[in-house]
């Protein structure tokens, strides 16, 4: 009998089990192993005692928030692989010291494998740091991989750059490792348009990566209407003085000009001068 993890990995779920995507992101796309954003652009503010919502993606936004003192993180993504990739990476950080962690990540990038071989089975090594659901997913993945039913890049996309993360430095990695002992991430399978229906709290900080860039793909009426719906939905779960952070790889969208008239947000941005292309981080602060 095929279990739910095989159905997930083999993309056999029925339409009723799939999450409607408001953007072009899919339910079963390979999940980024690393961010492709310059995380150093984000402000280094103290996030202790803040309610935080992040996009899941590679897990790096949640990890960056934890590095800056955040401890209670809600994380959402329409991609149902993202939470498992994030959880595995976090388990490895908890298990391994700085050099051992990045040595294993080099194996991943060079061999396109999680190094499930005779030298070490990473999943068994980090099992105590995975919950039951996460362990069963990765155990099923390995079973299917050995039997040539799935491949590494069906689940994980090694595109990105670990050096763009603040925790790529030993001092920050060790701080993150300590902070993870008191941190909790709750994952939601949700698209951005539905997240306000799936959570039961309000947030001080929201980190959306480049999701809004996809929502506001052009300044045509259709996309502007979508953008206004998304921001209006997020506004319902934001506390006074909260901030939404986003990333823009094209530096063309008008995030402040297309705001609904009944909403009041202050817009700010910082460009990445060393990226070689136009990229920026922007913030929408609730006034």
Regions found by a protein language model. Give the residues of each.
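S-adenosyl-L-methionine
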Residues: 1-48
């Amino acid at each position: 009998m095929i279990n739910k993890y095989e159905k997930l990995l083999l993309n056999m779920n029925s339409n009723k089990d799939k999450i409607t995507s408001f953007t072009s992101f899919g339910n079963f796309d390979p999940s980024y192993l690393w961010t492709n954003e310059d995380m150093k652009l984000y402000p280094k503010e103290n996030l202790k005692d803040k309610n935080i919502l992040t996009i899941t993606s590679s897990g790096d936004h949640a990890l960056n928030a934890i590095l800056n003192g955040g401890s209670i993180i809600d994380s959402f993504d329409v991609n149902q692989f993202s939470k498992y990739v994030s959880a595995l990476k976090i388990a490895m950080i908890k298990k391994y010291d700085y050099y051992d962690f990045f040595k294993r990540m080099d194996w991943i990038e060079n061999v396109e494998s999680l190094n499930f071989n005779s030298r070490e089975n990473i999943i068994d090594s980090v099992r105590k740091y995975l919950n039951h659901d996460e362990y069963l997913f990765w155990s099923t993945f390995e079973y299917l991989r050995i039997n040539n039913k799935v491949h590494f890049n069906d689940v994980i996309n090694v595109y990105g750059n670990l050096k763009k993360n603040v925790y790529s430095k030993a001092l920050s990695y060790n701080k993150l490792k300590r902070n993870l002992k008191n941190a909790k991430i709750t994952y939601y399978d949700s698209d951005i348009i539905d997240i306000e229906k799936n959570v039961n709290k309000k947030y001080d900080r929201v980190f959306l990566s480049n999701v809004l860039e996809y929502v506001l793909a052009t300044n045509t009426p259709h996309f502007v209407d979508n953008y206004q719906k998304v921001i209006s939905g997020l506004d319902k779960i934001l506390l006074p003085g909260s901030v939404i952070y986003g990333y823009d790889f094209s530096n063309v969208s008008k995030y402040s000009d297309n705001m609904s008239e009944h909403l009041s947000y202050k817009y700010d941005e910082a460009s990445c001068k060393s990226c070689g292309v136009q990229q920026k981080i922007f913030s929408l602060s609730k006034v």
